[in-house]
A protein has these predicted regions:
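Acidic catalytic/metal-coordinating carboxylates
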Residues: 36, 62-68
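Two-component/phosphorelay signaling modules centered on CheY-like receiver
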Residues: 14-32
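Active-site residues of response regulator receiver
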Residues: 55, 87
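As written
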Residues: 63, 99-105
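Conserved acidic carboxylate
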Residues: 11
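The feature encodes the CheY-like receiver
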Residues: 59
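Acidic, metal-coordinating helix/loop segments flanking the phosphotransfer/catalytic sites
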Residues: 33-51
């Protein structure tokens, strides 16, 4: 596997977070995890992901608010980081907002199997 190997997973549900972690580690990804915006921004101080998997519904700041900050504030160094929204929200307005804010993809959790995550990440490689 080349390319996007450092992944930051931002998911507030610990069971889902762990399930995704196991799958990605098994496929040789280096994973850091966060359950909310505070943990995410702390992780970004020392971890520089190639890809961020970002839930929309998070405690505190929403995934869309986080996405906007990551894309517009250079202090996070994520303007060119691949960011995929993983959410249970299928409303067109939410998906459109995510793409307008700079998401590289929007995946509805119920439409995929967790084992599909590595292929989703691989599809983002230039």
């Amino acid at each position: 596997m080349a390319g996007l190997k450092n992944v930051l997973l931002v998911e507030d549900d610990p069971m889902i977070r762990e399930m995704y972690r196991i799958i990605l580690v098994d496929r040789q990804y280096k994973i850091e995890m966060a359950g909310n915006s505070e943990e995410l921004f702390k992780k970004l101080e020392t971890f520089h992901p190639d890809c961020i998997l970002l839930d929309v519904m998070l405690p505190g700041m929403s995934g869309l608010e986080i996405l906007k900050l990551l894309r517009t504030d250079p202090k996070y160094g994520c303007q060119k980081t691949k960011i995929v929204i993983l959410s249970n929200l299928a409303q067109r307005s939410v998906t459109d907002s995510a793409i307008e804010l700079g998401a590289d993809g929007y995946v509805i959790k119920s439409d995929i199997l967790p084992k599909d995550l590595p292929e989703i990440i691989s599809s983002l490689e230039d």
